[in-house]
């Protein structure tokens, strides 16, 4: 995946918009993440197609809830006509989105907040994605050991985002349906790769008979992949993660990881902006749009449709 870093206005956008253009900012959770770079490119492309301004905004960490609230408030004050946002926190962004929606239509993508005032919610069905990932993990455990039995663990990127909660919920639903599978730990991170690595190393050390790890986000997969490399446990532990990056693709190709659940981040950004444009022009939007999820394995990673999702062309210039 060739990531081209977009020029981002990260924090303060008040007064930054052109006087007469329609302006629909896209506010993501972490402007430095490869996943969110793809979302921003999708939004940028929609803006180019519609002939509108699409400022590409966001804090530099998913843990910076206050920073995202500031970006949202400044975007409204700066003259946005509608807003697209992925909420860093279900609880923390509820009231700010309620307030923003008093002035402009708000389309939420990826992760919802505790608000009923958004025009639409466009995201992966994350519960189903969690089911998909953990079902694949359990299936491979059964294939390897002759039965769906053994110890498994979950590595959570961090508390707060609804998308991560939903993925864990879906995973737990699958695990609960197998009496022989024991969930020995759920590690809750702090939105850093270092913590994800340390959590995975701790799991591997603490549970020598561990047979599976499910990561609910890209950086968890990076941490687990590195941990499996360092400990030489890639053949013993079935690891599946959400999202993709160049390194995660390499981990699939060399067998370190056994599955990726990939989303459509470009589509989220693109559909989000187009939906927000329709909403500002008085059109009713569906309450929920499932943007889809796909299981990627060593068996299908070379397929043309999978390759197109893993390596989107990020050509938009804001």
Each language-model region and where it sits:
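Hydrophobic alpha-helical segments within soluble ligand-binding/sensing domains
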Residues: 68, 122-149, 195-197, 244-248, ...
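Extracytoplasmic "Venus flytrap"
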Residues: 23-42, 46-50, 55-69, 80, ...
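Short, solvent-exposed amphipathic alpha-helices that sit
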Residues: 35-50, 129-136, 162-181, 199, ...
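Hydrophobic alpha-helical
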Residues: 76, 81-102, 171, 185, ...
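Flexible loop/hinge segments that line or gate small-molecule binding clefts
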Residues: 90-128, 132, 144-147, 151, ...
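Short beta-strand elements in bilobed, periplasmic/extracellular small-molecule ligand-binding domains
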Residues: 48-61, 151-156, 172-190
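Hinge/cleft segment of the Venus flytrap/periplasmic-binding protein
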Residues: 151, 155-159, 163, 174, ...
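Bacterial N-terminal signal peptides
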Residues: 7-16
């Amino acid at each position: 995946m060739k990531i081209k870093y977009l020029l981002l206005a990260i924090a303060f956008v008040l007064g930054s918009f052109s006087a007469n253009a329609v302006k629909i900012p896209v506010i993501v959770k972490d402007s430095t993440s490869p996943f969110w770079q793809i979302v921003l490119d999708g939004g940028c492309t929609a803006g180019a197609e519609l002939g509108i301004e699409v400022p590409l905004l966001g804090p530099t960490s998913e843990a910076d809830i206050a920073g995202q609230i500031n970006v949202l408030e400044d975007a409204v004050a700066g003259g946005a006509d509608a807003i697209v946002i992925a909420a860093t926190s279900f609880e923390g962004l509820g009231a700010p989105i309620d307030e923003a929606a008093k002035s402009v239509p708000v389309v939420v993508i990826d992760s919802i907040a505790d608000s009923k005032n958004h025009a639409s919610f466009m995201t992966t069905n994350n519960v189903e994605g969690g089911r998909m990932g953990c079902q694949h993990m359990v299936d491979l455990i059964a294939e390897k050991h002759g039965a769906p039995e053994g110890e498994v663990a979950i590595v959570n990127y961090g508390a707060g985002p609804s998308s991560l909660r939903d993925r864990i919920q879906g995973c737990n639903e699958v695990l609960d349906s197998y009496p022989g599978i024991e969930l020995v730990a759920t590690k809750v991170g702090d939105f850093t790769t270092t913590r994800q690595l340390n959590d995975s190393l701790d799991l591997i050390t603490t549970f020598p008979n561990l047979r599976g790890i499910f990561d609910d986000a890209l950086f968890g997969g990076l941490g687990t992949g590195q941990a499996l490399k360092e400990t030489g446990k890639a053949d013993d532990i079935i690891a599946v993660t959400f999202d993709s990056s160049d390194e995660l693709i390499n981990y699939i190709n060399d067998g370190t990881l056994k599955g990726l659940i990939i989303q459509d981040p470009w589509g989220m950004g693109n559909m989000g902006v187009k939906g927000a444009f329709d909403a500002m022009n008085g059109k009713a939007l569906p309450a929920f749009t499932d943007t889809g999820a796909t299981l990627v394995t060593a068996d299908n990673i070379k397929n043309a449709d999978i390759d197109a999702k893993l390596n989107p062309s990020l050509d938009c210039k804001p």
